[in-house]
Amino acid sequence: MSKKIIVFGATGLMGKQIVKENLKLGNEVSVYIRQTEYPENVNFITGELSDEIKIAETIKGFDIVVSAVGNRNYEDPTMVVAPVGKLLSKLISSNQRLILVGGSGLTLHDNKTLRRDLAGQPEFLKNQRADHWEAYTNIAPLDINYLFICPTMVVEGDADGNYLSQENYFPKSEAKQIFAGNVGHFIAQEIVENKFSKTRIGLVNA
């Protein structure tokens, strides 16, 4: 049975692939964007991420709300993931599911250590790590149906299915990247299969 999905951040590297992979599976996809056109054949709603009233009205009637927003300027400390995530977590109803794309720093390296706390983490990603952590620590305690998707460095590339996923932990792999298409593939499959709730999933190319 197909799901009704709305994607925030649909014009970005991952957002486009999330839309693409969900369309492949026959889900009904809408996007909330600033632009007035979109390359895929989807319903689109034009609006700003700061417009709480419009977003509250827009997400009504969807089964799944996906946030793939992010700050594309790594040097800019302005948080994007956290404020949008916190807003959506406040607005969704009890029968809706919220899927948020964060980063692999939210996953565990071992029983005691988060990946974000390991030595040698890239300095240029410190703002992103802070943004993701702010989102996770505010949303994880809530009594809502959420799921954090935690990929390592996302690069251009369509889905090939050759990736690893693990709940709570970062999967062991020699790879240091993941194709945006594989992130989209996992999210689309999870929307159909509905295996995980109130948790986080690490992703990396195999």
Model-inferred region functions:
Residues 74, 105-110, 154-158:
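Conserved catalytic-site region of short-chain dehydrogenase/reductase
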Residues 30, 86-127, 141, 147:
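Conserved Rossmann-fold NAD(P)-dependent oxidoreductase catalytic core, especially the SDR/UDP-sugar
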Residues 146, 193-206:
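Core catalytic loop region at the nicotinamide-binding pocket of NAD(P)H-dependent oxidoreductases
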